[in-house]
């Protein structure tokens, strides 16, 4: 597998991409794809004068076998050692990190599908925002039912990258920015259910019984969860706007974990009715709910004859995890991250999972 390094030049309304080098002599590569945050990469390579001139901050790094993820070099570290040799560590994140350079300004009140809300935020701050534009940036493809659900919300001054991935985690979708010729395309999508709880798609089961689960650890903690929100908005005293929010049936007794959400700075604009304003408060309440904390670490077979990563399953998909020896099964668990590692020992896969309720 080769790495391709491109020079990126930003002009007023477009970008220009030119191939600078092709590299296959790196010592190691980490390629970390995440579903609810911006992914990242690391290249560890001998620090020759040629490599130092090739790997420059702001340039694009991509893999010859991945047409969806493009990294931008953000950090370089050069280390010289008379005995061990000279090495260059190149790190960065995928192109969605460009959205971190903008905030949502001014206040945006939006009502419609989540797709429409994202389009409005990006249009006002990234696409049709004058000198605030990201050159060549536009919306790409949209897929997944979660993006067609509707909401009303008010948002201001949030960092766009943090806001977007926070929204993604709330609704169960994701976003990715990719190169399309000399353009930047922002795709919105969702994962596919491949667990044992459905029959529309082939099942993906990682299990010690199938020899495709090399190691597995799991921990759960209820202490951090919040499942019922009291949301207070604008106004004073008895006139203060207030509502509550929970997901599904209202929790009771020992199953109820409450949180207070202060939205006094969320103004009710003249064209917003009381009912619409309460929906805005409910959206904020949804963002402050916290699921029980779970953590799992595992290693899965990189060269399994049963399932191939990025062919049979992808980051964001729902799969089944089973540890038969201890009688532990997670029938529907989401793959929210995958670190692919390439080094002298070959290729390895380290997944991150999020348990579903």
Please place each PLM-identified region on the residue numbering.
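Amphipathic, non-transmembrane alpha-helical segments in extracytoplasmic/periplasmic proteins
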Residues: 34-36, 43, 92, 107-138, ...
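Surface-exposed cap/loop segments at beta↔alpha junctions
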Residues: 48-139
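Envelope-exposed proteins and targeting segments
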Residues: 39, 69, 86-88, 182-186, ...
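Polar/acidic, low-complexity leader/linker segments enriched in S/T/G and N/D
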Residues: 1-24, 196
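Short beta-strand-centered interaction patches in the first periplasmic/extracellular domains
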Residues: 77-99, 137-225
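Short conserved beta-strand and strand-loop elements enriched in small hydrophobics
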Residues: 3-5, 57-66, 316-324
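Solvent-exposed coil/turn segments that connect beta secondary-structure elements
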Residues: 76-78, 93-97, 191-193, 234-236, ...
């Amino acid at each position: 597998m080769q790495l391709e390094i491109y020079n990126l030049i930003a002009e007023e309304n477009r970008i220009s991409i030119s191939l600078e080098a092709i590299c296959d002599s790196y010592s190691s590569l980490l390629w970390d794809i995440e579903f609810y945050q911006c992914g990242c990469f690391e290249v560890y390579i001998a620090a020759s004068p040629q490599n130092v001139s090739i790997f420059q901050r702001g340039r694009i790094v991509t893999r010859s076998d991945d047409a969806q993820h493009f990294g931008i070099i953000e950090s370089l570290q050069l280390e010289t050692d008379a005995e061990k040799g000279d090495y260059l560590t190149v790190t960065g994140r995928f192109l969605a990190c460009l959205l971190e350079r903008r905030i949502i300004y001014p206040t945006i009140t939006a009502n419609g599908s989540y797709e429409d809300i994202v389009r409005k935020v990006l249009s006002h701050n990234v696409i049709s925002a004058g000198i605030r534009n990201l050159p060549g940036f536009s919306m790409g493809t949209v897929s997944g039912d979660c993006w067609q659900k509707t909401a009303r919300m008010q948002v201001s001054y949030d960092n766009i990258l943090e806001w977007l991935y926070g929204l993604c985690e709330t609704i169960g979708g994701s976003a990715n920015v990719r190169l399309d010729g000399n353009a930047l395309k922002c795709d919105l999508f969702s994962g596919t259910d491949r667990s044992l709880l459905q029959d529309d798609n082939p099942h993906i089961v990682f299990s010690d019984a199938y020899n495709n689960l090399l190691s597995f650890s799991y921990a759960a903690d209820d202490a951090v969860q919040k499942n019922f929100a009291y949301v207070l908005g604008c106004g004073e005293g008895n006139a203060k706007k207030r509502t509550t929010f929970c997901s599904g049936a209202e929790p009771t007794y020992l199953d109820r974990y409450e949180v207070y959400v202060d939205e006094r700075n969320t103004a009710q604009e003249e064209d917003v009715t009381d009912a619409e304003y309460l929906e805005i408060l409910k959206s904020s309440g949804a963002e402050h709910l916290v699921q029980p904390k779970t953590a799992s670490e595992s290693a899965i077979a990189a060269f399994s004859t049963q399932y191939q990563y990025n062919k049979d399953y992808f980051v964001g998909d729902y799969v089944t995890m089973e540890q038969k020896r201890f009688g532990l099964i997670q029938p529907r668990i989401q793959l929210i991250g995958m670190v692919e590692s390439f080094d002298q020992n070959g290729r390895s896969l380290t997944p991150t999972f999020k348990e579903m309720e």
